[in-house]
Amino acid sequence: MNKIKNTKKIISDSFNQKINFYNNDKYLGLNVNKSEIYSIIKFLKDNEHLLFNQLIDITAIDYPSRDLRFDIIYILISLTLNQRIILKSPVNENDNLDSITLIHKSANWYERECYDLFGIKFINHPDLRRIMTDYNFEGHPLRKDFPLTGHTEVRFDEQEKKVVYEPVKLSQEFRNFDYSSPWKGLENQLIGDEKAKKED
């Protein structure tokens, strides 16, 4: 039995509820319910046959048209098995997730980053505040409905000797860009050219 199949069997045997697996040759993926994230990650770390004891990342993907707007993603590695596992769970933008900082201390900053950039909240987090944007920043910049220009401009005012927030002032009107290239005679395709129709 290969390593991925063995890992899948250990997880299936240990959890009564049905877990939806997906995998390729390089890693095993689990689609899990948000209420099971904490217990599954704890199991993956503590089980002597798995030892997924290194948290690599926590991130999210925004799907604004879905009811469950975000997929929250946890990536773990077992150095013992030389194996990667990815947990994915769909969550609503108003859902509160259990913090896994008691299992993996490195989750602290990852969860803060998800909160700051996507607005996903984690309960029982020791210090859930913004980590990448300013404390007075409006909105969450990795949400797909966040305006490209932002809501405010931030600058340091030399006269007032403090940071000043002002409405965004654009030197030209906002433009939407299409990545298909209007240029003729280019040998190599530019990024986005694959969607432009080729002329005969």
Label each region the model flagged.
Residues M1-D200:
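Terminal low-complexity/charged segments
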